[in-house]
């Protein structure tokens, strides 16, 4: 959760909270790339980032909702070109760390929680899951 404090549910499957320190879109992108070991692209809204919404997968279209809930930026897996343009124009930062990159890191935690919830069912996390894309 990027060290977020005061975390609340966001958009059903995401979270919104306060970062330990104010940062920039680039600083957040660098921290995300290091934490997840992925490539990160960002649209810099040009404002300091303290409150962050996080949603795995494809949630670029949720940036308006994130902004309405007081977030300064949204970190997600996929963001369209036009979502990035609109958010940037509105002074809101969007970061895209890849669909795979934002979902696979939590797969083990989900498997553990499912196993605890359903002890009579054997839960197995796939080890063959891979990002379908190749990167330069």
Question: What spans do the regions from the language model cover?
Answer:
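Hydrophobic structural segments
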Residues: 1-136
């Amino acid at each position: 959760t990027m060290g977020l404090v005061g975390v609340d549910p966001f958009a059903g499957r995401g979270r919104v909270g306060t970062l330990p320190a104010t940062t920039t879109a680039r600083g957040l992108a660098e921290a995300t790339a290091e934490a997840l070991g992925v490539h990160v692209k960002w649209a810099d809204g040009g404002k300091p980032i303290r409150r962050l919404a996080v949603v795995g997968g494809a949630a670029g279209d949720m940036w308006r909702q994130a902004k309405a809930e007081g977030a300064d930026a949204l970190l997600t897996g996929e963001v369209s070109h036009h979502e990035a343009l609109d958010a940037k124009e509105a002074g809101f930062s969007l970061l895209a760390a890849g669909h795979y990159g934002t979902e696979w890191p939590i797969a083990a935690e989900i498997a553990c929680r499912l196993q605890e919830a359903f002890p009579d069912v054997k839960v197995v996390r796939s080890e063959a899951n891979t990002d379908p894309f190749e990167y330069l």
